[in-house]
Amino acid sequence: MAVPKKRTSKSKRKIRKTVWREKANKAAKKAFSLARLILSGRSKSFCYTVNNKSSESSESTSIDESDDS
């Protein structure tokens, strides 16, 4: 079985952990930004399914709203 010859220094562990956290934060920020865009109704490039409780069928809807201002 392969065994590491020396311990990894604290600084190297800290650097690797920081890089991992930065990647996770970037992915979370991007996902949150996309979610806000979709929920605000300003998105024009997303197609998603809308489930109506009154009807059993689902419809594919794209958001194409003009600016109401």
Curated annotation (Swiss-Prot):
Biological process according to GO: translation
Domain of life: Eukaryota
Keyword vocabulary terms for this entry: Chloroplast, Plastid, Ribonucleoprotein, Ribosomal protein
Cellular component terms (Gene Ontology): chloroplast; large ribosomal subunit
Entry similarity comment: Belongs to the bacterial ribosomal protein bL32 family.
HAMAP family, per the entry: Ribosomal_bL32
Protein name, as recorded: Large ribosomal subunit protein bL32c
Name of the gene encoding the protein in the UniProt record: rpl32
